[in-house]
Design a protein with these regions (language model features):
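Pan-zinc metallopeptidase signature
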Residues: 276-377
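Active-site recognition of the HExxH zinc-binding catalytic motif
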Residues: 209-226, 257-261, 265
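Short, acidic Ser/Thr/Gly-rich low-complexity loop/linker segments typical of extracellular
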Residues: 37-53
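Short Pro-Gly-centered beta-turn/loop motif in secreted/extracellular proteins
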Residues: 27, 53-63
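Post-HEXXH active-site segment of zinc metalloproteases
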Residues: 222-252
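Short pre-active-site segment immediately N-terminal to the catalytic Zn-binding motif
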Residues: 194-211, 251
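Short, ordered, surface-exposed loop/turn motifs in non-cytosolic proteins
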Residues: 10-39
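Zn2+-dependent metallopeptidase catalytic core
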Residues: 55-57, 72, 98-168
Length: 377
């Protein structure tokens, strides 16, 4: 225990977490700090430098804790599961304050890494106009798992169906819940997580990628809502994770995953200040058929911004052709480049090109594109 000091003081300090990829400690952003001494309690949040100053003064050294309830509007569950937010009790220390460096492999490292990636994602949303995930987002971190998911089950009000021998248990197994399937299935919706993050064996950089992937799904949910997500979940239940690219709602799933995977990788590269302009997508195709390469190319070649792509992920966009049609509708002057981003990556749109107003251009492309009878709605 650190020595007491005379007089009332407002405790302050800095909380950092170790980035084992960069080899340095980085601030833990926006997390709640709680101080108490018997019946006196005080809370505040760290700033973007990881620094905090308590609102209340203490004459004697209080007990310090980090509570993973972030000022941006999300909670992280961990050691207490759905009962309470994850927290790190730091013990009794001086009333001058207490600082903590959270090392890789230590008790709270996973929570701090997930916290920072989520904080940065919310900040990106504020800067770009991409919708944030739904309010009061619940993220449950599992330190021994390697899989993650964004089921959003507590927010889905539409029926979820499945075909064949699939069931809720199969669904949970398919997205990595394993032996917890039965327990989670019986929990009330209000205590189900929106997102699960598996951090087992992951570096800080990998956690950053995975968290941004899942949060991109949550932003997608904010725009399309329950009915769309029920179809997404039904596909997972029926075909097992991503399936093989066939079956009902396969392209709906493919669109969601091309957005999620590419956003995870793009955000990760931006955080580490690595340009993707001259970097061909090198992560492979999830399940062999999903093509994050499309969104990656649209961004790295500055054809469309992340926000412009996001604006096309609306209700009714549940096939590749409908996605292309929406992009053509919004950005007709980029139609040729948009088409190329798809065809270069193995997806051939069957959508008519828009009339750009350029007679020479339109005349040249009239016979190039296969006409489509599909009507976008």
């Amino acid at each position: 225990q650190e020595p007491e000091t005379r007089g009332k003081r407002r405790p302050e300090g800095t909380i950092r977490v170790y980035d084992d990829y960069a080899g340095t400690f980085v601030p833990v952003k926006g997390v709640k700090i709680r101080c108490h001494r018997f019946i006196k309690w005080s809370t505040t949040f760290t700033d973007e430098s990881g620094h905090y100053t308590m609102d209340s003064k203490f004459r004697f050294g209080p007990h310090y804790a980090i509570v993973f309830d972030n000022r941006k509007g999300f909670d992280i569950w961990g050691n207490w599961g759905p009962i309470a937010r994850a927290n790190l009790n730091m013990g009794w220390h001086s009333n001058r304050g207490h600082s903590r460096d959270i090392n890789a492999g230590s008790f709270a490292w996973d929570w701090a890494a997930v916290n920072n990636a989520t904080y940065d994602y919310y900040k990106m949303c504020e800067e770009t106009g991409i919708a944030k995930p739904p309010r009061n987002l619940k993220i449950w971190v599992f330190k021994r798992w390697t899989t993650s998911s964004t089921p959003m089950l507590r927010r889905i009000v539409h029926p979820i169906g499945y075909n064949g021998n699939s069931s809720w248990k199969n669904f949970f197994i398919n997205i990595g819940y394993g032996t917890l399937a039965t327990v989670l299935n019986q929990m009330l919706k209000k205590v189900l997580p929106d997102i699960t993050i598996g951090t087992g064996g992951h570096s800080y950089r990998k956690v950053y990628d995975v968290v941004n992937h899942e949060l991109s799904h949550a932003s997608h949910f904010s725009q399309v809502g329950s009915a769309h997500w029920a179809k997404y979940i039904s596909y997972i239940m029926t075909y097992g994770s991503y399936g093989n690219g066939t079956g009902k709602n396969a392209e709906l799933c493919g669109i969601g995953e091309m957005w999620g995977y590419s956003m995870g990788h793009i955000q990760e590269h931006e955080y580490y200040k690595e340009s993707i302009v001259n970097r061909v997508y090198y992560f492979g195709s999830p399940s062999g058929w999903i093509k994050p390469h499309v969104v990656w190319d649209l961004c790295r070649k500055s054809i469309l911004t992340k926000k412009q792509i996001y604006d096309c992920l609306v209700v009714g966009v549940d096939t590749y052709d409908r996605l292309v049609a929406k992009m053509y509708e919004k950005y007709p002057e980029k139609a040729d480049e948009i088409e190329k981003a798809f065809t270069d990556n193995g997806i051939t749109p069957n959508v008519p090109k828009p009339d750009t107003g350029d007679l020479t251009h339109d005349a040249f492309y009239t016979d190039k594109t296969v006409s489509s009878s599909f009507i976008f709605s």
